[in-house]
Curated annotation (Swiss-Prot):
NCBIfam families: PRK05738.2-4, PRK05738.3-4. Gene3D superfamilies: 3.30.70.330. Keywords: Ribonucleoprotein, Ribosomal protein, RNA-binding, rRNA-binding. This is Large ribosomal subunit protein uL23. The gene is rplW. The keyword rRNA-binding applies. Belongs to the universal ribosomal protein uL23 family. One of its GO terms (cellular component) is ribonucleoprotein complex. It comes from Nostoc punctiforme (strain ATCC 29133 / PCC 73102).
Amino acid sequence: MPSFDPRDLADLVRRPIVTEKATILMEQNKYTFEVIPKASKPEIKAAIEDLFQVKVVKVNTNLPPRKKRRVGKFIGYKPQYKRAIVTVAPGDEDKIRQVLFPEV
């Protein structure tokens, strides 16, 4: 497995995606993140393992289509993003949940 610079890995993951579907996937140890579009699966795996100190079993990626947005007569597009669904090893789900959803 190639080695990645840990300073660059933190910039790959933008934010966790919390939707109804993502919440249902959390019951199966799958967590959804928004990542930069040029990130590869090995880079995403290394970034999640480095940020959350968990063992990643599998990474699925999805590049949804850009949505049109209109302001008056001007038509533009929302920014492109990539969605990564990361499967975490059994037993590590507590580590990642403590970071994503801290107790208040």
